[in-house]
């Protein structure tokens, strides 16, 4: 009788769905209050003036204006601020 040996099993074959993280509004772009600026895990970018921080570390605009990225402080942290238009 013709036989074929059974194939082995594997623990691979899955992948998680991408989370679409990253900068959503870049420096110089106009934003409205409530617009999401950055989606991130942890505080790669910190909230500056007129920017709110969500519970998942999402940065969002608190007022209308232009987005500005800057490096400040002794630890050279990246801050996102909104300058009033």
Curated annotation (Swiss-Prot):
Gene3D superfamilies: 2.40.50.100. Keywords: Ribonucleoprotein, Ribosomal protein. The keyword DNA repair does not apply. Residues 1-22 are annotated as: Disordered. The keyword Ribonucleoprotein applies. GO terms for molecular function: structural constituent of ribosome. One of its GO terms (biological process) is translation. InterPro entries: Ribosomal_bL27 (IPR001684), Ribosomal_bL27_CS (IPR018261). GO terms for cellular component: cytosolic large ribosomal subunit. SUPFAM superfamilies: Ribosomal L27 protein-like. Coiled coil: none annotated. HAMAP family: Ribosomal_bL27. Belongs to the bacterial ribosomal protein bL27 family. This is Large ribosomal subunit protein bL27. It comes from Photobacterium profundum (strain SS9).
């Amino acid at each position: 009788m013709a036989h074929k040996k059974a194939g082995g099993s594997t623990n691979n074959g899955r992948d998680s769905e991408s989370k679409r993280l990253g900068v959503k509004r870049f420096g110089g772009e106009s934003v409205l209050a409530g617009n999401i600026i950055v989606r991130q895990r942890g505080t790669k970018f910190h909230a500056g003036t007129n920017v709110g921080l969500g519970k998942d570390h999402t940065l969002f605009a608190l007022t209308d204006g232009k987005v500005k990225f800057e490096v400040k402080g002794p630890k050279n942290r990246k801050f996102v601020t909104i300058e009033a238009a």
